[in-house]
Amino acid sequence: MKRRIGIGLAAALLVTCPTTWATEAQSIEIKVEDIASLKKYPKVALIGYAIEQQNFLVKMSTSWGSTSSSTSEVTLEGVSTPAMQAATDRLYADLVKRLEAAGLEVVKLDEVRNDPMFADLKGDKPQPSPSETSFVFDKSKGFKNSKALVFSPSGLPWHIPSAHEEAARFGAGDKMSANLSRAFSGKQPVADVENALAKARGITLLKAYYVVGFGRAGGRVSEMTSFNYVSNRSEKTISAAANATAELYLDKTDTRLALRVPGETPTLRMRNNSSPAADGSGFIRLDKKLSAGADFAVGEPKNANSTETQVGNALSTTLAVVGGLAGIRGVGSASTQEFVVTANEQRYVDTVEALIQTVQAEFVDRLAAAAK
């Protein structure tokens, strides 16, 4: 079920942080999946909370049938770890407060924390906050990993979902490593332990996850092959460009509130390289990117560095090989441009908090309605 809510984001931002600038009004689209069974177990426990702060984007662009590529790398600077950790702690407290204010029966974390199954989920060495993760940005071609820091509240470390329930954008190696680590330790998969914990306590487990993006990376590559009758040879001309833009936003789909209801089996869904996380039996998701624009940034993205590498027997961007078109196959150019987006830390943090608070309010409204 999908529901669209019209809201002036500018108003939400201004209420939360009066010094924040105006932003275009936009709609918040929330998608609800399989949460009706919450009525059976309306008592809830928030056992996971995380904010994924993306800070390095890589986008590789190619043209069909070409050996040439253009790669854009964009780095976020200006936001400190202590500032994001403090924001994460405040936002976690905000969600707990909203759940209680909505009339939901919320199990105190201390009641669940003492359960051996909860300790099993978090592991012998719980994830630190922040922990670094890598992912594929915007279906970038090649094995180019973008990076993010995953923050969790003080005292509530994030636990990585089972590999088959994790978002497809995360590297297969990372997901396999987490699963193998549990298997070698004699532990059950995370999904099985969550199910057992929910069933043993007769409660619905909740996990909140927010994906904070800071910009876009892009580029293009084009090739033109022609025959020079004067020199009697074929020539290939390669044109490549990369670009970057600043934009602070909550990404859709993987920004979610996941529910694990006792005895409920997740709906079977076909998974592909675009599949979102499916770490629960039901979900309340952000179904459309929620953007606050580029006012958090200090100026435009800066081009920090650029490199170009020839692929094949080539000496320049305009490549010539005697012997016809067949002779220039496999000849190309690989270029990389690096950009830096510098944030005003206070504006960045204030805006992230306003965005997440707005979405948390919508998530809690749907959850409370389903529990009645």
Question: What is each model feature region?
Answer:
Residues 1-8:
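Bacterial N-terminal signal peptides that target proteins for export
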Residues 8-16:
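Bacterial N-terminal signal peptides
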Residues 18-22:
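Sec/Tat signal peptide C-region and signal peptidase I cleavage site
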Residues 23-283, 287-372:
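A structural "domain/chain start" motif
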